[in-house]
């Protein structure tokens, strides 16, 4: 089974997240994309105290109508920081026959060398770096951390960097949606409409539960 992994704080999940998942699913013929909300993200401090369970519920609402999308709460079942390598190891134990495609924004990939055990991530799965506004990668090989660059070989015909482990790094350009969770939170706090930025069930849930208002 070819399985995509899309992690994030999802605070809240929005249409750009969903479109990225769909573009990668389509481009790489994935059987499923698993959305994995981060319980305690090491790279992005959480703004506000939005509980993990609430963010998971928003992801469930956003993905409920797509049989190719699934949601996992495995990071909420662990203590400590939500390191991606720990999540990958757990998924490989749970689903030993799957081939995983780790989906990451180009902005995060450019900082990949600062990630916990990033070398092990390259040896654990395929990686799909997805273009994000303001973070275009023009030379994928140059974006690889210098310390591990000799472990890769570029395959021009397939536009991928093959790692010595057998996995590859790909770059997917041209996903134009520029939507930010922080802008959605700001609109919600001001009582303004967030319609068409998030799926309708998520917008309703945010409004009904007063998730981003101070008097929640």
Swiss-Prot record:
Query: EC number(s) in its UniProt entry?
Result: 2.7.7.18
Q: Which CDD domains match?
A: NMNAT
PANTHER family in UniProt: NICOTINATE-NUCLEOTIDE ADENYLYLTRANSFERASE-RELATED (PTHR39321), PHOSPHOPANTETHEINE ADENYLYLTRANSFERASE (PTHR39321:SF3)
- Biological source species: Geobacter metallireducens (strain ATCC 53774 / DSM 7210 / GS-15)
Descriptive protein name: Probable nicotinate-nucleotide adenylyltransferase
- Pathway(s) per entry: Cofactor biosynthesis; NAD(+) biosynthesis; deamido-NAD(+) from nicotinate D-ribonucleotide: step 1/1
InterPro entries tied to this protein: Cyt_trans-like (IPR004821), NadD/NMNAT (IPR005248), Rossmann-like_a/b/a_fold (IPR014729)
Q: Which GO terms describe its molecular function?
A: ATP binding; nicotinate-nucleotide adenylyltransferase activity
Q: What does this protein do?
A: Catalyzes the reversible adenylation of nicotinate mononucleotide (NaMN) to nicotinic acid adenine dinucleotide (NaAD).
- Alphabetically, which GO biological process terms does the record hold? NAD biosynthetic process
Q: Which HAMAP family match?
A: NaMN_adenylyltr
Gene3D superfamilies xrefs: HUPs (3.40.50.620)
Enumerate the UniProt keywords alphabetically.
ATP-binding, NAD, Nucleotide-binding, Nucleotidyltransferase, Pyridine nucleotide biosynthesis, Transferase
Q: Which Pfam families match?
A: CTP_transf_like (PF01467)
Q: Which reaction does it catalyse?
A: nicotinate beta-D-ribonucleotide + ATP + H(+) = deamido-NAD(+) + diphosphate
Q: Output the superkingdom of the source species.
A: Bacteria
């Amino acid at each position: 089974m070819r399985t995509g992994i899309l992690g994030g704080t999802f605070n809240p999940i929005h249409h750009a997240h969903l479109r990225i998942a769909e573009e990668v699913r389509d481009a790489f013929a994935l059987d499923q994309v698993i959305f994995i909300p981060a319980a305690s993200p090491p790279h992005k401090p959480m703004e506000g105290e939005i509980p993990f369970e609430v963010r998971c519920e928003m992801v469930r609402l956003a993905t409920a109508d797509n049989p190719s999308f699934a949601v996992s709460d495995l990071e909420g079942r662990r203590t400590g920081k939500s390191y991606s390598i720990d999540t990958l190891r757990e998924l490989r134990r749970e689903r030993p026959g799957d081939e995983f495609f780790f989906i990451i924004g180009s902005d995060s990939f450019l900082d990949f060398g600062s990630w916990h055990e990033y070398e092990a991530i390259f040896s654990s799965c395929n990686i799909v770096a997805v273009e994000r506004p303001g973070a275009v990668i023009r030379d994928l090989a140059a974006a690889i951390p210098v310390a591990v660059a000799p472990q890769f070989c570029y395959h021009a015909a397939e536009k991928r960097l093959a790692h010595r482990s057998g996995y590859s790094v790909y770059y997917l350009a041209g996903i134009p949606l520029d939507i930010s969770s922080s802008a959605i939170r700001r609109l919600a706090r001001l009582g303004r409409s967030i319609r068409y930025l998030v799926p309708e069930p998520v917008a309703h849930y945010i409004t009904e539960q007063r998730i981003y208002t101070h008097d929640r």
